[in-house]
Amino acid sequence: MSDRVKITPMTLNFGPQHPAAHGVMRLVLEMGGEVIERIDPHIGLLHRGTEKLIEYKTYLQALPYFDRLDYVSPMCQEHAYSLCVEKLLKCEIPIRAKYLRVIFCELTRILNHLLNISSQALDIGAMTPLLWMFEEREKILGFYERASGARFHSAYIRPGGVAADVPDDLIDDIFKFIKTFPKFIDDVDELLTENRIWKQRNVDIGIVSKEQALDWGFSGPMLRACGIPWDLRKSQPYEIYEDLEFEIPIGKKGDCYDRYLVRMAEIRQSIKLLEQCLNRLPNGPIKTDDRKIAPPKRSEMKESMEALIHHFKLYSEGYSVPIGETYMAVEAPKGEFGVYIVSDGTNKPYRCRIRAPGFAHLQAIDMMAKGHMLADLTAIIGSLDIVFGEIDR
């Protein structure tokens, strides 16, 4: 009689209520013992019909929907939408507004990567980074609140500029924060990067080759971890990125460990970008002077009838956008976040298509996890950096 144990294939449901699923994700796993043979992701549990809802809102009213897509890094999505509308309007925004946008987008990148690295570590069993990193995230959310009045859904970056100017003491506090923050990142680096257990759980897990990454439509840290130095801030510069100096961190193998290293390096590059922006931040207006697009100041409305009419018309009817269609993408923390708008010349978008980076990454999970152990699946999901607000839309 053979000593070999006959393993019967088993179907396993992972999620939709599971702490390592990073939201409402259901995976149907076909297991051969403890080895994954096939993964079938079921998405759509957080579908809210965002793209359709936008068609019934004015261009300004549609903005808050973008905060609620990838709710971990909201400002980058507002940015993509605002750039898209501005392109259709052929609207130029003041240089100070461009600097403020880049400052908050880079703070958002740090915010996103802190959450991803800490939750990836927690999924694998390291609890300390989560407690450390959430303390730093709170500081950045405090900057959000002081600039816009909201910690998460800020609606700060708007077509025509930014919602409001930042107080001088906020700029000073961000500067103080980025002076002490690199020391904190060094501590996290020391805690995780060469940690034996961390490396055992991440090295050679979920390997993706350059060819596979391009075939699946990867972008952001997922693509750069495979060794492809593609970053929209360099390849298709927008705002003031072409005037700033920074490097594109890339990986070698394209495994979970490389994805972690790329995100850690990106945090350091964001600090470098923030330092340059804060040192160069010019004075001046923060909105376009076209009162059909950006509202007038409150003080103007008390004296000028035209300003009051502009304000009323902007917040009741909105502005009409010329007929046309355009696509605009930004380098969001998770990858290429794109917005495609078709305008029919009215005050509402005829069609708004959203390109979420997480969707392309999640569809490749079967290819990444096949042949791995069930325990490795949490490491792979953690390294994907998925948020279901943007995937399900």
Swiss-Prot record:
Catalyzed reactions: a quinone + NADH + 5 H(+)(in) = a quinol + NAD(+) + 4 H(+)(out)
Gene Ontology CC: plasma membrane
Compartment annotation: Cell inner membrane
Enzyme Commission code(s) on record: 7.1.1.-
Keywords tagged on the record: Cell inner membrane, Cell membrane, Membrane, NAD, Quinone, Translocase, Transport, Ubiquinone
Keyword Iron: no
Any one GO molecular function term: NADH:ubiquinone reductase (non-electrogenic) activity
Record's bilayer topology term: Peripheral membrane protein
HAMAP family, A to Z: NDH1_NuoD
Subunit structure: NDH-1 is composed of 14 different subunits. Subunits NuoB, C, D, E, F, and G constitute the peripheral sector of the complex.
Family: Belongs to the complex I 49 kDa subunit family.
PANTHER family with a match to the protein in the record: NADH DEHYDROGENASE [UBIQUINONE] IRON-SULFUR PROTEIN 2, MITOCHONDRIAL, NADH-UBIQUINONE OXIDOREDUCTASE 49 KDA SUBUNIT
Name recorded for this polypeptide: NADH-quinone oxidoreductase subunit D
